[in-house]
Design a protein with these regions (language model features):
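Transmembrane alpha-helical cores of Major Facilitator Superfamily
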Residues: 18, 50-54, 81, 108, ...
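Transmembrane alpha-helix termini and helix-breaking/packing motifs in multi-pass membrane transporters
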Residues: 64-69, 91-92, 151-172
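Hydrophobic core of transmembrane alpha-helices in multi-pass small-molecule transporters
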Residues: 18, 86, 98-117
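C-terminal ends and interior cores of transmembrane alpha-helices
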Residues: 77-99
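Intracellular juxtamembrane helix-capping segments at the cytosolic ends
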Residues: 31, 114-129
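Glycine-rich segments within core transmembrane alpha-helices of 12-TM secondary carriers
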Residues: 55-59, 135-160
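Helix-loop boundary and gating motifs at the non-cytosolic
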Residues: 2-56
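Loop-to-transmembrane helix entry/capping segments in MFS-fold secondary transporters
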Residues: 42-43, 129-141
Length: 172
């Protein structure tokens, strides 16, 4: 960052890495439990959730092209917004008759956005912090990524179970 606009990394490293962990865990683990509770067949769950995880595997294919269009910081902010909106659309699609098709489509958007966020977030971390600062904040990076995993896999699953018990469930 330039000297006149320098922001302490403690203000952005935790949130960036929390935002990296949340979509990955929500799509790879929590969605499986949700679809299973909603009556989707195991074969469909396995196929579609495996497919929507591909963007994280294919990150190296589009990472070189990101800065041709906008900055890494732009992609960090934009992908966080896209991911948030797409999660909202997943939630809104669940009561619909063809919820599975819509939910998978929105989750595909989340996957591409989340993988792009990972690329951009790591890029910002590497370019904005020197080696000493990177070493200083590596613990924060890992802690908040893992906190996202815990809250998503524990807290979100608990919340979903509570809502299912109080509101009911939509069956596929």
């Amino acid at each position: 960052m330039s000297d006149n606009k320098s922001i302490n990394p403690i203000c952005w490293v935790p949130t960036v890495y929390f935002a990296m962990g949340l979509p990955f865990v929500a799509l790879s683990m929590v969605s499986v439990l949700m679809f299973s509770d909603m009556g989707v067949s195991n074969a469909q769950i396995a196929f579609w959730t495996s497919l929507i995880m591909l963007p994280w595997t294919l990150k190296p294919l589009w990472s070189p092209f990101l800065e041709m269009f906008k900055t890494k910081k732009y992609f960090v902010v934009a992908t966080q917004m896209v991911t948030g909106v797409a999660f909202g659309l997943v939630a809104l699609s669940l009561p619909l008759p063809d919820f599975f098709c819509y939910a998978i489509a929105f989750m595909g958007v989340i996957a591409f956005s989340g993988a792009t966020h990972d690329i951009a977030g790591d890029g910002v971390y590497l370019t904005e912090l020197n080696a000493t600062m990177q070493a200083k904040y590596i613990g924060w990076q890992g802690a908040f990524y893992n906190l996202a995993k815990i809250l998503t896999n524990g807290g979100l699953v608990y919340l979903a179970g509570s809502l299912k018990d109080s509101i009911g469930i939509v069956h596929a």
